[in-house]
Amino acid sequence: MPASMESPGAALEVLDKRIVPIVEAVARAARDAGSPAVRLERALEVLFGAYGGSDPGLSALLLEGWVRAQRDKQYRLRLAWQREQLRLLLQDILAEGAVRGLFRSGLDAGAVAAAIVSAAEGCLLQAAMQGGAVSPAELSRALVALTLRGA
């Protein structure tokens, strides 16, 4: 049954079953051993793999969720929570890497993390349209490279 035909509670459960594991996987990658650059790369592999992995079901679910969020507070809160968790996890990695001198000097970790999440969300649109000019893996690698000191 399409998400738009389900009860709001059931549709949110479906959303949670797909989104929460992605957030948890990014959290594991962010907290793994390794340098901030390695952890950032792993976290982005998870995020871009999930969002750009040609899963039309996930893409449709999130795109539908964004539309519902305009009129449904529960969707708005759920999707805001998910986005903020991802942003904060990435921000923590970026901030640590900047302090340790691995990432660009003066890096605005919060703004860069938000840009990364936005780029990943753009992959959902590409997945819905059967791909884009730049693969999610290439985009992920480019974003990591842009954060590195000396890039």
Question: What residues fall within each predicted segment?
Answer:
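An amphipathic alpha-helix adjacent to DNA-recognition modules
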Residues: 2-27, 41, 87
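Hydrophobic recognition helices of helix-based DNA-binding modules
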Residues: 14, 18, 22, 26, ...
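C-terminal peripheral helix-coil segments that are non-catalytic and often amphipathic
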Residues: 38, 42-50, 87-88, 92-96, ...
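Hydrophobic/aromatic-rich alpha-helical bundle segments in the mid-to-C-terminal region
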Residues: 76-80, 84, 98-145
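Hydrophobic alpha-helical connector segments
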Residues: 24-59, 109-116, 137
